[in-house]
């Protein structure tokens, strides 16, 4: 009985230590969510405007650019998988990796070979453990991404995409580099503190809705005059467009990671509280039984002495 009581008290101390860790992680994640959410909201207008501007440029001048035109018989598709560097964030990484596997299966059904790029140590470890090739990976900034991080990733993806413009099947073409024909990104969309979901988006070829001569119902159509010419503007803005899309995805993923970690740590803290209460109740019962037994032994001994007289 004494051994059982010592074991229960040891488990109570262990649960208390774990509770301190999970509570600290919960508080840290809570403090980061507001900042991450503010960064997401601040980046959205720029992302929306640059996409709108590129759409207007392409629609107004009917540009024929590699990032706009879908290639015939695409064979390879780059997929950027955005995960976290650390764990303790619930099903955050599992959902992203499941979404990426679904995208891989879809691409293979279409006859396209997925070319994997990763952000975060968790995705890199996932593919390395399964001995699957990762073309390039980035880590160390999943919770606090910067535009410089996004630009580095975007430059790599755009270079691979542009290298694929002259490829013919498995032939690397004139540049000798086997590139890709599509760019995709898998990340976690941040909708609210309580709602985040894994999503897959195609970055390139860019989808452009061409506007005809019809006037919109709610007013006249806006006419734009571009200086310099649309082609020059388009070449200058396209790299920024890809970097902006990647940056927006990194920011949403960072906010989602913090929200998921806060939720997971709060659940772990609550479970630790419940476990400690249950263990204390069991310990109190054991102690009560031990005291009752000791009293019974004392009374029994006293009665035995009285009878012997």
Swiss-Prot record:
It comes from the Bacteria. The keyword Chaperone does not apply. PANTHER family: ATP SYNTHASE GAMMA CHAIN, ATP SYNTHASE SUBUNIT GAMMA, MITOCHONDRIAL. One of its GO terms (cellular component) is proton-transporting ATP synthase complex. Keywords: ATP synthesis, Cell membrane, CF(1), Hydrogen ion transport, Ion transport, Membrane, Transport. The keyword Cell membrane applies. Its main location: membrane. Belongs to the ATPase gamma chain family. It holds the Pfam family ATP-synt. InterPro entries: ATP_synth_F1_ATPase_gsu, ATP_synth_F1_gsu, ATP_synth_F1_gsu_CS. It is found in: Cell membrane. F-type ATPases have 2 components, CF(1) - the catalytic core - and CF(0) - the membrane proton channel. CF(1) has five subunits: alpha(3), beta(3), gamma(1), delta(1), epsilon(1). CF(0) has three main subunits: a, b and c. It comes from Mycolicibacterium gilvum (strain PYR-GCK) (Mycobacterium gilvum (strain PYR-GCK)). Signal peptide: none annotated. Produces ATP from ADP in the presence of a proton gradient across the membrane. The gamma chain is believed to be important in regulating ATPase activity and the flow of protons through the CF(0) complex. NCBIfam families: ATPsyn_F1gamma, PRK05621.1-2. This is ATP synthase gamma chain. GO terms for biological process: proton motive force-driven plasma membrane ATP synthesis. It is a peripheral membrane protein. GO terms for molecular function: ATP binding; proton-transporting ATP synthase activity, rotational mechanism.
């Amino acid at each position: 009985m004494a051994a059982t009581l010592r074991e229960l008290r040891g488990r109570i101390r262990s649960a208390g230590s774990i509770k301190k860790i999970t509570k600290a992680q919960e508080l840290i994640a809570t403090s980061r969510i507001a900042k991450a959410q503010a960064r997401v909201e601040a980046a959205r207008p720029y992302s929306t405007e640059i996409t709108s501007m590129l759409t207007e440029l392409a629609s107004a001048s009917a540009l024929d650019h590699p990032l706009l035109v879908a290639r015939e018989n695409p064979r390879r598709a780059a997929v950027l998988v955005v995960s976290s560097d650390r764990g303790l964030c619930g099903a955050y990484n599992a959902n992203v990796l499941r979404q990426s596997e679904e995208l891989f299966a879809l691409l293979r059904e279409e006859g396209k070979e997925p070319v994997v790029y990763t952000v975060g140590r968790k995705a890199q470890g996932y593919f390395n453990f399964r001995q699957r090739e990762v073309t390039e990976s980035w880590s160390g900034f999943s919770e606090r991404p910067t535009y410089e991080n996004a630009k580095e990733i975007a430059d790599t993806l755009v270079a691979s995409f542009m290298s694929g413009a002259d490829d013919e099947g498995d032939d690397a073409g004139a540049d000798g580099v086997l590139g890709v024909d599509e760019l995709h990104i898998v990340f976690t969309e941040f909708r609210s503190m309580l709602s985040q979901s894994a999503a897959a988006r195609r970055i390139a070829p860019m989808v452009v809705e061409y506007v005809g001569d019809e006037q919109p119902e709610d007013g006249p159509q806006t006419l734009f005059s571009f200086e310099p010419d649309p082609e020059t503007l388009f070449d200058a803005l396209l790299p920024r467009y890809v970097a902006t899309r990647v940056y927006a995805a990194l920011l949403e993923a960072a906010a989602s990671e913090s929200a998921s970690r806060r939720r997971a740590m709060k659940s772990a803290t609550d479970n630790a509280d419940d476990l400690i209460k249950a263990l204390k109740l069991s310990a109190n019962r054991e102690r009560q039984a031990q005291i009752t037994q000791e009293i019974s032994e004392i009374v029994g001994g006293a009665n035995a002495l009285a009878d012997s007289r």
